[in-house]
């Protein structure tokens, strides 16, 4: 089981009321994330678990390709290193606490310098050698869905408690494309939440129709450039006008699948790795209940 950790703790923060630690610090995201993990482990009983981390939430190599990529979330540009992301003031202090608690539990936290959690997930899900559940609220990861390799997404767009199990049939029914076409579909459609403009005038229906007819983005572009190809003049013009965008967007949308990651140490712990540290963290931050719940679930897994 691969967790898109930031996607989960952001949802925990915005989906839960303020919960204060003894010192008055809000810890709702910490508690919510721990309860999410408890629920998922209890329901799915994974043998391995990794909390995948954004070591760089807006990698420079993606920004160099499309400068609007996540630009609306930047609060401070940093010349060397990741830009500062807009994060609520009462969520920001909770992130290091999350790291400490996960470490005390012995739950693997996996990141890669210069890459997003999506890229870590893409790499770990590829050739995993076992069934993989990807837990995320990010639709981009639908591109990883693969029935043959038993890779599916547990989509938490509507909340972890109401997550949807995304397989190839789900993607087909929802968007009218195959999971293997989803990255091209997302490239054509665009995604305002990530600052990806898409092809102007091409929405989900047109993107699905084009992929159904031509198969992939390369063939769509080839048809648009071929006067003899059967393509409506208006669509042809839109694809042609987006040529510069389409030259680079596929590399931004596609998640990495070949990062040099250490795959050892991903087994689900059956007990906390550092009980003393975990107890101290639980006392300091008022986390007794969620820590006890997750400890109990791990012992039963």
Residue ranges and their predicted role:
Residues 47-50, 148, 165-301:
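Non-catalytic nucleic-acid-binding/docking modules located in mid-to-C-terminal regions
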Residues 1-135, 139-161, 165-167, 247-248, ...:
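Noncatalytic, basic helical substrate-engagement surface that gates or grips nucleic-acid strands
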